[in-house]
Amino acid sequence: MKRLCIPIVETTMGKALIAIKEVNRLADLIELRADYLRGAKLALLLENRQKPFIVTNRSKEEGGKYKGEERKRLSFLQEAIDLGADYIDVELATERSSLQGLIRNKRGTQVILSFHDFRRTPSPKELQRLFGQMIRLGADVIKIVPFAKSWEDNLNILSLIPFAKARRQKIVAFCMGEKGKISRIFSPSLGAAWTYASLNQSRASAPGQLTVRELTDIWKTMR
């Protein structure tokens, strides 16, 4: 089953609420990129969701827009848990005790533990080592997204999906970049929990991200 997550990357509450209304029609999941949004009123945003909702507050070091104090960045994720968000996305690079605190206090929220590498794709052995580390930390969903410098990098990242399935672990895994587009398309067919697509080209939240229309058109031709 192919599942599609669409990120909300608006900068104002008004635009974010309009985008959520549109994304409710098109997506299986919604990701709020809170690092883009000024003055986020999280309770109001969650009230308007009709699909499972991921709250992400991505650090600048991992390709996000957040530039404030780390303490405030993480307290926003804790607020998302307290308000009943379906998922939070928190980086593996987060200071360990803070990360463990979020996982310990997650209540009914599932924790997506994420790793991004904007320079390269690790070897299959390195990817499996990362996977094991994230399992031990208590991730509900593992998300590993490196950068494809070659077509072969797609094979490396996609090989992690059956590896995770054999261990009954939910995973999101694909490559960023122009050469990584193919892994975005095929990862759900191999068993990834979902893949990401933007509402349009100007709203892409990562390099190589396809639009909803591009991705769904490709999937239709694959039937």
Give the role of each language-model region.
Residues 36-50, 92-108, 122-125, 149-164, ...:
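Active-site-adjacent beta->alpha loops and helix N-cap segments on the catalytic face
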Residues 162-223:
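C-terminal alpha-helical cap/extension of soluble enzyme domains
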Residues 7-9, 29-38, 77, 85-96, ...:
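Catalytic beta/alpha-barrel core
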Residues 26-28, 50-52, 82-87, 104-113, ...:
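Glycine-enriched alpha-helix->loop->beta-strand junction motifs that scaffold or abut catalytic
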Residues 53-101:
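Glycine/small-residue-rich loop that forms an oxyanion/phosphate-binding "nest" at active or ligand-binding sites
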Residues 15-25, 73-83, 129-138:
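Alpha/beta enzyme core
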Residues 1-63, 69-74:
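Conserved N-terminal beta1-alpha1 strand-loop-helix module at the mouth
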Residues 69-74, 124-130, 156-159:
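Charged helix-capping and loop-helix junction motifs
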